Amino acid sequence: MAKDAIKLRAKVLEAYSMDDYLVELENKQQIKAKISGKMRVNRIRILPGDLVDVELSSYDLTKGRITYRHK
């Protein structure tokens, strides 16, 4: 997912658990996103309303991975 990933900015709408989130992309599309491994290891908290960077696979545009939380 590294080479052909699509990077977008999104806003977190809802937190389902510590790993699963509902995010809204810049084009108003809502997708499910999981937190990346580095963010999980470093225990970075993500709350509803946060702006995050999401990577989407070109194979499945309905699921993403949160890679960065903006301050």
From Swiss-Prot:
- Pfam families with a match to the protein in the record: eIF-1a
Indicate the principal place this protein occupies in or around the cell.
cytoplasm
> Cellular component per GO?
cytosol
Keywords assigned by UniProt, alphabetized: Cytoplasm, Initiation factor, Protein biosynthesis, RNA-binding, rRNA-binding
Known role: One of the essential components for the initiation of protein synthesis. Stabilizes the binding of IF-2 and IF-3 on the 30S subunit to which N-formylmethionyl-tRNA(fMet) subsequently binds. Helps modulate mRNA selection, yielding the 30S pre-initiation complex (PIC). Upon addition of the 50S ribosomal subunit IF-1, IF-2 and IF-3 are released leaving the mature 70S translation initiation complex.
Spell out the subunit comment: Component of the 30S ribosomal translation pre-initiation complex which assembles on the 30S ribosome in the order IF-2 and IF-3, IF-1 and N-formylmethionyl-tRNA(fMet); mRNA recruitment can occur at any time during PIC assembly.
What this protein is called in its record is: Translation initiation factor IF-1
Which organism's genome codes for this protein?
Mycoplasmopsis synoviae (strain 53)
This chain is encoded by the gene named infA
